Amino acid sequence: MSTYRDFTLAHRGSARGTVLRTIGTRERRSHLTAPRVPTVGIDIGGTKVMAGVVDADGIILEKIRAETPDKSKSAKVVEDTIVELVLDLSDRHDVHAVGIGAAGWVDADRSRVLFAPHLAWRDEPLRDALQSRLAVPVMVDNDANTAAWAEWRFGAGRGEDHLVMITLGTGIGGAILEGGQVKRGRYGVAGEFGHMQVVPGGHRCPCGNRGCWEQYSSGNALVREARELAAADSPVAHNIIARVGGNVAEITGPLITELAREGDAMCVELLQDIGQWLGVGIANLAAALDPSCFVIGGGVSAADDLLIGPARDAFRRHLTGRGYRPEARIAKAQLGPEAGMVGAADLSRLVARRFRRATRRRVERYERYAQLGRRDAAAGPEDQDQQ
């Protein structure tokens, strides 16, 4: 695996380009030297960990995946999985930085995962733990932030000055970009839209509350409703029951989407219900944030217009002041399930640049000290006394 000494020596004088300068939690456009080396992005979701090598243009050079360790396992088990994936990729690629998109609340310094509803992380110092084991710079961010960054840089959000990303997977993630900056909030946890309570006293959420938005418009919500109908042996569920051989536990989101495309009435209606709740939430976010564009991503978005069509309809019905205000565009994400991984890799490239500049400053400082030491040694003790 490459170290940062290798990186510094190999990439002095790399091509200049427009990059984003990281200051605290803000990214600003800056025409500075940026390393255009491949970096590794890792997207950690509730069911899978996806890792890939991504170049500076957002092109995936290679990707691999593993199952997400069970929530009951220790936080270190997830860390071990990440390290194994990075080491596997480093056998075939130079790894100069690693970006992590984590399904949880990440602090403002992007170093600790404060809480992850679907994982065992509780105030987990993930960045430092991984950095010490991988010997390269590591960046940690919320997975929706990394997905939004990727869509703004390379996908459906290009050219938008105010974008809101909504990711529908195991739960619901969210992110806000304005003027080329990810808005993380004072404590780093802005965009946790999935835990807005939309049904007081409703379904229990892994976060500990009831009635969260993600309990009504997510992959988990979709599968829960289908399994409940199948377990009750509802006549509308006979088709999906037959497809899984009567094993209700085998019902998955992709299967529901597949059957909906084939015209299965129950699956079509389930996706419509999920879409309706999605549209209601988007209308609420439009009232609060007034973006120019909503980008819908995550695994559930693979249902395309079976989901997004009902969402657009519900959005228009519930939008405050409709007819008297501009309406935000609702677009499906273009980068698919790899968006979080691509965005994490791209954001880690900014961290790599900062490390590179810091390394250069340290080298220059040491060289100055060495020159002073050589000069003092050449002067001799008598000359130094005279000075």
Predicted segments, located by residue:
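Short, charged low-complexity linear segments at domain edges
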Residues: I176-E192
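Short beta-strand segments
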Residues: D43, G99-A103, D141, M165-G171, ...
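Short, intrinsically disordered C-terminal tails of secreted or membrane-associated proteins
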Residues: P381-Q386
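Short hydrophobic alpha-helix segments
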Residues: I64-A66, P117, R186
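ATP-binding/phosphotransfer module of carbohydrate and carboxylate kinases, centering on a glycine-rich
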Residues: S2-G13, G17-A97, D107-R112, R127-V138, ...
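A short acidic/small-residue loop/turn micro-motif
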Residues: T68-D70, W121, V189-E192
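Adenylate-forming
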Residues: A147-R153, G174-I176, H195-M196
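Active-site nucleophile and cofactor-binding loops and adjacent substrate-binding regions
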Residues: P117-D123, M139-N145, M165-L168, A331-E338
